[in-house]
């Protein structure tokens, strides 16, 4: 990045003074919006082709500008492009480089176009492509989660299910994985829905009111891969809800990945001991040689905060901007870039890490048996015998209190103690209420019984086949 002696601004005709150096520094966005260079040149190529098609530019002018733009693009891709701070942004840098390459005819590129619709189309292109890319990466992780569910379903690995981080009821590990499959399916859908809504081209809206030039906005929209042009020029250049929706989808996905991260961090501790994370995705301590730190999950959990912040930042920017374009909207891009980059790496890391994570089935099963996780099953047993559930709940609550005071499990209570609580209970009944039986009994649709989880796995696999057209 260079900051050369100021040249005449492309917009400088009405100004008598040069821009102050501090204003140059404060005003410039090229340090980050150069990331839109490819989208900017694609938009310009579509625009100049349309100008030629409408007879606004001659064929020779279109050819010169097109060749020049392709040359600038080649320089950018090769890393030979000089980005200049005094040229403010990606648009002015590209146009000035085009002028340096082909001369004054470059000035005709901006016919019937404003930087307002130019940046809007660039940013929509980027955000739409980012949404579709994150949708694909989310689907890839969803597929990994589904494969893990199917793998652990084979041995019906049991895991404690928690509420309030207290052991609640036993579940299948496959059921736990399928919960994340469901979350990721919705996350993917949010990105695809957002991409569909932002599939409109603002190019041709000009500054805000449209243009007297006979443009073909449908042609440029089609050339850029949009479904249609935006229907209102004010909305086209002044709205950033497409970026807000993208950031919202990013934030919700980040929340889900943060919850996953929190569970994996807990489960990998000595105190839980449920999993062993792969060496390839953990780190050590500079002083404690025994440490194996879950840095991937901790960073994924921590980075959720910045993704949330990106959404809140843009909401705060947009809320006070009157129609149409305001310089405030320069602040729309960095958060989108950052959220996209952050989630892209987190999704790929988890797709790598989860298949290499080892689950200790004996430990998870033993943990599921602790904490009176089958207490609800005892209450359900009484209810099936005709005891009102609220009465059954109170009876079993008393038994849990008795067992906890003597540091025993429910099945360790004596026959006399059980019958004293309720005549329908006995040691024989309590011994049958195992975690395996508890899991098998959860036969309701969406429940954790092996048959129900197997159905859910097959349904999820079929849905993926339908979505992708792949076996």
From Swiss-Prot:
EC number, as in UniProt: 4.3.2.1
Q: Which GO terms of the molecular function aspect are on file?
A: argininosuccinate lyase activity
**Its GO biological process terms?**
arginine biosynthetic process via ornithine; L-arginine biosynthetic process
Q: What keywords is this UniProt entry annotated with?
A: Amino-acid biosynthesis, Arginine biosynthesis, Cytoplasm, Lyase
* Involved pathway(s): Amino-acid biosynthesis; L-arginine biosynthesis; L-arginine from L-ornithine and carbamoyl phosphate: step 3/3
* Location in or out of the cell: Cytoplasm
The answer to whether UniProt assigns keyword Lyase to this entry is yes
Tell me what reaction this enzyme catalyses: 2-(N(omega)-L-arginino)succinate = fumarate + L-arginine
Which CDD domains does the protein's record reference? Argininosuccinate_lyase
Keyword Cytoplasm listed? The answer is yes
What's any one GO cellular component for it? cytosol
Q: Which family does it belong to?
A: Belongs to the lyase 1 family. Argininosuccinate lyase subfamily.
**Identification of the protein by name:** Argininosuccinate lyase
Q: Which organism is it from?
A: Deinococcus radiodurans (strain ATCC 13939 / DSM 20539 / JCM 16871 / CCUG 27074 / LMG 4051 / NBRC 15346 / NCIMB 9279 / VKM B-1422 / R1)
As recorded in Swiss-Prot or TrEMBL, the protein's gene is named argH
């Amino acid at each position: 990045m260079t900051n050369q002696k100021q040249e005449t601004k492309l917009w400088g005709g009405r100004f008598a003074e040069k821009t102050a150096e501090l204003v140059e520094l404060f005003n410039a966005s090229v340090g980050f919006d150069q990331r839109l260079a490819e989208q900017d040149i694609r938009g310009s190529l579509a625009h100049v082709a349309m100008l030629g098609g409408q007879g606004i530019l001659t064929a020779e002018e279109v050819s010169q500008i097109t060749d020049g733009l392709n040359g600038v693009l080649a320089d950018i891709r090769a890393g030979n492009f000089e980005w200049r701070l005094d040229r403010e942004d990606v648009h002015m840098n590209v146009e000035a480089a085009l002028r340096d390459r082909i001369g004054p005819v470059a000035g005709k590129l901006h016919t019937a176009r404003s930087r307002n619709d130019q940046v809007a189309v660039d940013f929509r292109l980027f955000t739409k492509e980012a949404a579709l890319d994150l949708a694909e990466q989310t689907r890839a992780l969803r597929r990994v989660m589904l494969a893990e569910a199917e793998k652990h379903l084979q041995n019906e690995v049991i895991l404690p299910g928690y509420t309030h981080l207290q052991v609640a009821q036993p579940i299948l590990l496959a059921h736990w994985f399928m919960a994340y499959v469901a979350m990721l399916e919705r996350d993917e859908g949010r990105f695809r829905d957002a991409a569909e809504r932002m599939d409109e081209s603002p190019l041709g809206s000009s500054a805000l009111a449209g243009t007297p030039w006979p443009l073909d906005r449908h042609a440029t929209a089609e050339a850029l891969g949009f479904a249609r042009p935006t229907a209102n020029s004010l909305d086209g250049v002044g709205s950033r809800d497409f970026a807000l929706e993208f950031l919202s989808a990013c934030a919700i996905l980040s929340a889900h990945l943060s919850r996953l991260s929190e569970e994996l961090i807990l489960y990998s501790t000595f105190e839980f001991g449920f999993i062993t994370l792969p060496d390839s995705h953990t780190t050590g301590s500079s002083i404690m040689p025994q440490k194996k730190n879950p840095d991937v999950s901790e960073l994924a959990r921590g980075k959720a905060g910045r993704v949330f912040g990106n959404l809140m930042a843009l909401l705060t920017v947009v809320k006070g901007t009157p129609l149409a374009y305001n310089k405030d909207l320069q602040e729309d891009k960095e958060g989108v870039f950052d959220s996209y980059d952050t989630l892209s790496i987190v999704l790929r890391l988890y797709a790598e890490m989860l298949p290499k994570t080892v689950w200790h089935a004996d430990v998870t099963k033993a943990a599921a048996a602790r904490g009176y996780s089958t207490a609800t099953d005892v209450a359900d047993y009484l209810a099936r015998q005709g005891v009102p559930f609220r009465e059954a709940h109170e009876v079993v609550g008393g038994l849990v209190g008795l067992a906890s005071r003597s540091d025993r499990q429910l099945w360790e209570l004596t026959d006399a103690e059980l019958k004293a609580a309720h005549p329908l209970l006995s040691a024989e009944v309590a011994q049958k209420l195992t975690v395996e039986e508890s899991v098998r009994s959860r036969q309701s649709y969406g429940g954790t019984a092996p048959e129900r989880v197997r159905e859910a796995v097959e349904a999820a696999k079929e849905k993926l086949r339908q979505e992708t057209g792949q076996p």
